[in-house]
């Protein structure tokens, strides 16, 4: 396994692979890798001849009061996980490699980025889309893998790839959870013992919503109500949003039907956590 910080090195390596007709799978990450990331790498390893993982804490997707400086980083640990999982190349650039002082081009999107996380993080998705498009141009993968935990991000990337004719297949992979149900996240490390216990309210409330849908409930308001009431029982929890939206367009819907995303964002203490489930039929 190689670790490169230079765009030119990655391009040179991928070009050599493609000259041999080898397929390339790509997993973009911000590092501090966990089992959720490993599941994406495993999927990429299974479906491609070569696998590239990027580790880049992208400053552009953090707001002015967000946790860029404190976002957890551990390249040695990440490299061990990647090597054990069969990754061929880690791309770990410095911000200066990705963004020159003259940088002024951005990917923006209407609609999909204004709801859910976009409401309280208005510049977040512009940063995500811009860096992901840059990474696609650098790595030129056949397939790229994203987790369903960041469901809005997955929808946004799919739309960007379609709208801008990017020649890459986007693969969404299931949420990976701890044994007690908490969705795996790098930000879980911010939680103290009491907050970690309180954070279970996210998966617990979504389970109630899912059970209601399974019984045939079609009212989005009814589903939101049962989820909200459960979260409000937890003193350490503060709701950012509880929403039911069309998964493809991220627009609010009043009726539970096919391809509907039930998504929540909740502050546990100072840590903002997200979770969701998708109604497939």
Where are these regions (language model features)?
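Nucleotidyltransferase catalytic core that binds NTPs
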Residues: 2-236, 245, 249
């Amino acid at each position: 396994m190689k670790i490169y910080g230079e765009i030119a090195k990655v391009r040179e390596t991928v070009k050599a692979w493609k000259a041999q007709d080898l397929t390339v799978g790509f997993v973009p990450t911000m590092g501090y890798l966990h089992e959720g990331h490993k599941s994406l790498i495993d999927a990429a390893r299974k479906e491609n001849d070569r696998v590239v993982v990027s580790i880049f804490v992208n400053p552009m997707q953090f707001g002015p009061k967000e946790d860029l400086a404190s976002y957890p980083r551990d390249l040695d640990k990440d490299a061990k996980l990647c090597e054990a999982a069969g990754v061929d190349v880690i791309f770990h650039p410095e911000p200066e490699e990705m963004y020159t002082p003259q940088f002024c081009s951005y990917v923006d999107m209407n609609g999909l980025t204004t709801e859910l996380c976009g409401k309280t993080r208005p510049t977040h998705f512009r940063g995500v889309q811009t860096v992901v498009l840059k990474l696609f141009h650098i790595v030129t993968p056949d397939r790229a893998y994203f987790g369903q935990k960041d469901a809005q991000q997955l929808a946004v990337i799919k739309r960007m790839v379609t709208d801008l004719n990017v020649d890459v297949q986007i693969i969404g992979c299931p949420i990976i959870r701890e044994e007690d149900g908490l969705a795996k996240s790098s930000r879980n490390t911010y939680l103290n013992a009491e907050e970690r216990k309180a954070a279970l309210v996210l998966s617990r409330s979504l389970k109630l919503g899912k059970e209601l849908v399974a019984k045939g409930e079609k009212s989005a308001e009814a589903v939101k109500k049962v989820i909200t009431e459960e979260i409000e029982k937890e003193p350490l929890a503060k709701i950012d949003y509880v929403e039911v939206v069309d998964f493809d367009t991220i627009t609010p819907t009043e009726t539970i039907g096919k391809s509907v995303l039930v998504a929540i964002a909740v502050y546990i203490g100072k840590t903002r956590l997200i979770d969701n489930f998708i109604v497939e039929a």
